[in-house]
Amino acid sequence: MKQKNVLGTDLEICNENPMTGFFRDGCCNTNEMDVGSHTVCVIVTKEFLEFSKSKGNDLTTPRPEYDFPGLNPGDGWCLCAARWLEAEDEGCAPRVKLLSTNEKALEIIEIEKLKKYQIDLN
């Protein structure tokens, strides 16, 4: 059964190049093993990548041992909900694809905050 997005419809693909998601399936699917709640589909920016690196999570450096190519501004990525909220508090939250953001993100982030940063609904 497909997981749902924050709008209650089927969760859509976030990104497949680079492959994202806790399960590396391109979607922000989650389960109880995903303690970081990698549920928010974002389009990363230079500012966010610098912020993440300053917090000890370098997303730009390739890590071949994890089949991770490193991210560049403009890449889609399933981000930990708490990290997105922290970035929002710091003024550098990346934009969000609501149709690709798992409903589980709502356990940590209010829908109205996510909607302020949405890029896929017009």
Segments (PLM) and residue ranges:
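Glycine- and charge-enriched low-complexity intrinsically disordered segments
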Residues: 102-122
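Short alpha-helix capping/helix-loop boundary micro-motifs
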Residues: 60-67
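Extended boundary segments
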Residues: 1-47, 118-120
